[in-house]
């Protein structure tokens, strides 16, 4: 999963933006992260969130002179909140069939713009300038609309891949000593 997240981060840098959605990007990384949040136990989810946020910042934050608008590591916190929300639905993901997986995929797609809105809010706060236009709205909501179409297919692909390699998400059992 970690390799898929890294390759997806690289891949989505080269996907052209959607012109008819005013330059909205196609984002696969949140779908991979949210699937991992459903399939893995909490310690692995935290590692996945940390690496996803760190790699996202390292690949997307411009390194220039002057005061940075966005500090490396901020995306870790931004991804942590929706990942923990999704992780709360893990028992439903484990016990139910494909219909629950589809609903959870759409919930993950709805949470995708949250990450972009949080990034925009942090940058605007650092710059002390809250400029809002239709282009900005589309660049925040557009990836969510795209994710509503792509995330179920990403979940289906990852479910098939997990069955192929023999990984079955199981409920965590607490051991009493």
Which functions belong to the PLM regions below?
Residues 1-177:
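Terminal, non-globular segments
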């Amino acid at each position: 999963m970690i390799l898929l997240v890294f390759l997806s981060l690289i891949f989505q840098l080269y996907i052209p933006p959607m012109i008819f959605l005013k330059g909205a990007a196609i984002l696969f990384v949140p779908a991979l992260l949210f699937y991992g949040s459903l399939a893995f136990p909490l310690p692995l989810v935290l590692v996945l969130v940390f690496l996803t946020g760190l790699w996202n910042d390292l690949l997307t934050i411009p390194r220039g002179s002057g005061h940075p608008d966005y500090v490396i590591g901020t995306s870790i916190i931004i991804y942590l909140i929706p990942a923990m929300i999704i992780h709360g639905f893990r028992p439903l993901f484990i016990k139910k069939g494909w219909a629950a997986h589809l609903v959870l995929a759409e919930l993950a797609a709805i949470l995708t713009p949250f990450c972009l809105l949080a990034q925009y809010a942090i940058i605007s706060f650092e710059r002390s300038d809250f400029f809002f236009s239709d282009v900005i709205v589309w660049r925040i909501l557009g990836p969510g609309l795209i994710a509503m179409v792509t995330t179920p297919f990403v979940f289906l692909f990852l479910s098939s891949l997990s069955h192929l390699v023999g990984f079955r998400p199981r409920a965590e059992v607490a051991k009493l000593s």
